[in-house]
Amino acid sequence: QNYPKNQLPNFYKLMDNKVLKSLADEFSNIHLKSFSQQNLRFSSRFIFSLLINPQISYIYKKNKGFCIFSINKEDAEIITMAVVPKYQNHGIGFLILNELDEVLLKSNCKKVFLEVASNNLIALHLYKKVGFQNFGIRKNYYKILKDKKVDAILMKKVVNLQK
């Protein structure tokens, strides 16, 4: 079936809650593995609340990584993205972001935004590689240990498939 470009179907919205809860558990586990060093984790309950929101979509590479994002007219935001450490630097994140570009183009989205911890060098490298640029900093935004905070780097990118 063909859909208007700005009304792509959210097939997972048709899933029942049991399936979505299972998916939320999977995403939460991947998130924990990816961010264990930073002591950051999105709970399964929080991820489930995202997945049932009609404004939220995701891209999933089974057992390897995912990206949860929102689209609001011509702008999109990556809410979180995680790749299992053993698959980092193996192209999974690159594939996810390329697929995200395709989805955003079909949705007539012009820009995508994200924030990333300043000490997450692997993610910073990946985002810059696919065309994201820094446009600001949130000082001491992420609390990674009991008494340690790191800045959030704000990044944006013009959506296109040309790298």
Predicted regions mapped to residue ranges:
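Acyl-donor (CoA/ACP) binding surface of acyl/acetyltransferases
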Residues: 139, 150-152, 158-162
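Conserved catalytic-core motifs of GNAT/GCN5-like acyltransferases
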Residues: 113-115, 128, 133-150
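Acetyl-CoA-dependent GNAT
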Residues: 1-4, 8-14, 22-88, 94-99, ...
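Short hydrophobic/aromatic beta-strand or adjacent loop that forms the aromatic wall/cage
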Residues: 55-57, 149-154
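Short glycine/proline-centered loop/turn elements that form peptide/ligand docking sites
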Residues: 93, 97, 120-123, 140-146
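Conserved GNAT acetyl-CoA-binding A-motif
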Residues: 104-115
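Residue-level recognition of the GNAT/N-acetyltransferase active site
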Residues: 84, 115-119
